[in-house]
Amino acid sequence: MKIKVNGEEKKIELDQENALLSTALNYMGYKPNTVVVELNHLIINSMIWEKVKLKDGHNLEIVSIVGCG
């Protein structure tokens, strides 16, 4: 499946059954409690990432949260 992540096209090896947002984020190495995800211009609540299916051509913007003191 090909999706756009932060403006760059990426090929992710997930079949349609496992093409969940949570699975894709894990595959790409993101930690769920440290990112905010926008899918096709809508911010997706992390509580439903396991229910959101990705499709070819979807656009993800992923912002990592970094704490500093």
Mark where each language-model region is.
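Ubiquitin-like/PB1-type beta-grasp interaction modules and other compact soluble beta-rich domains
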Residues: 1-68
